[in-house]
Amino acid sequence: MRNILPDYVLRLAEMCLRITGKPLYAVGGIVRDFLAGFPLAGSDLDLCAPLPAEEFSALAQSAGFTINAVYKRTGTVKFSVRAENAGEKTADFEFAAFRRDVYVRGEHTPTQTFFTEDIVSDAKRRDFTCNAIYYDIARDCFCDPLCGAADVKEKRLTCVDAADKVFGEDGLRLMRLARMAGTTGFTPTEDTLSGAKNNAALIADVSPERIYNELLLCLNADERYGVKGGAYAALSLLDKTRVLDYIFPELTAGRGLAQRADFHDHDVLEHSLRAAGYAEKSVRLAALLHDVGKSEAFREEGRFASHPQRGEAIARDILTRLKAPARITERVCALVKYHMYDYDLKTKENKLRRFIVEHAEIADDLLLLKQADYSACKDDLSTAPCVKRWRALTDKMKGEGVPFSLKQLAVKGDEIAPLLPSPRFVGAALRALLLHVAVHPQENTKERLLYLAPKLCAAPALETR
């Protein structure tokens, strides 16, 4: 492993051993990834030693590193160095002194920290044995106090201590378990699964922001190492441990809710998890939530017809609760609202043309969502009929020169403003012109649009646009 580490880290480790007599270890993800044969690009290089933070900080500074922060309570040092190759960016590192942590049940941050020189105690403050393998940089050897290397070899996720204790200490580990399973393809042991399920309620003690961030990592789990089906594996584990019940009770209300057998092989919840798994990265969150309105619709109406509209409102509540960015919330809600549009292929072409232009900003993602939805019905990876139709029509419209944005219209707002009763009509008039030429692209000329603008403005529909 020595040959994958930068020279300046090797020199720091050798200096640490020579001056203090204590080894400097690499630990965590980079060691696990090396032993598992995963790509190391993007792996964090976390360092640790049986050494006080202040002593390590002074040592690193004397070796030419920049000290960015020292946290005495946790024994953590954040430091950086400019790479020797001038073309490279500054490299950031984190050091942690060997320690033992004490938690209030379920909280993410330890309430007490005790420093130690015992590597076993330090290993047992971590989450899974595969993340508790130490590499002695100067001596070029591994130290494996909890037999994590065997778990890496067997692709197992085993807790560093009794599973009830590990998950009971830190509720966020419940989601980290799912993320790790998705990113690595490792399988949790039965004890690990049981401990997570027993402590699932502790996820409620974790801040919404942390839950949202971990959820995104789960949704993108297959991106890290290219493990096929990683997103679905992560979400399925959240379901299996019942953590999903506390994060998305509106979604898990679909567990066991059957759908038409001629269209679906799975209940509403499983269909949603599979849709997220089949979806492209940009629409996975929308795919997870696309049918979130079905349970409410069925409960109140005995049918699913209104689920897109109900789902939009429910998705907004969920994403607001998780404090997702407003931009993400609006986009996901729009996709949920329209994911069933033209599902039966009966929408008239002119109406569909106007819809595609009016929703051009989400049209590509809407097709991706429709495809994921279709694939998740019966695990059919062929192109969805609706997607075929929309793509063919979109190509046809592009060939005809249909404008898909106001910028592509042959007139500007200041050109039609003098022709309208009031400046307040300009925006609505431009949108009306855009929808008109979606059906009549040959009329996207300045002369024709200047003629049409006041006539469209006089139309009653414009008053409500």
Model-derived segments and spans:
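Catalytic cores of the polymerase beta-like nucleotidyltransferase superfamily
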Residues: 1-465
